[in-house]
Amino acid sequence: MADTLTYNIIATTTLGANAGSVTFSSIPGTYTDLVLVSNVATTSSTNFGYYLNNDSANNYCVVNMYGNGSSTSSANSTTEGALWANWSNYTSTTVGNSIYISNIQNYASTSMYKTVITRGDFGGDRKSTRLNSSH
């Protein structure tokens, strides 16, 4: 049986220095879903998030669940300015590198809200699952 790819890589970037933002543009609307995999270095006072279609208005709803192995917590908001992958409420001041995997369902649809599920490991002691949607 021949190997087949589950995903097609349509864009990548590797930064040579710190950057406040990265833009992926001209993503074709021919796919159903997108998967964004990020390796991000942040501190406890920095949020990591992204916008869909350059929309930075308070058009995003988020539900966040996180834990550190001995305790759990959750938070939500209906008026966020981005699809945040994390919230700045860590137990240490330097988090280090964090891996996030975001699944963006039906991203090209114009007839429904965008739903994004992001899972992350904050490089410290917190693990997170986050459900985001745009409205």
Regions found by a protein language model. Name each.
Residues 131-135:
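Positively charged, low-complexity/disordered segments
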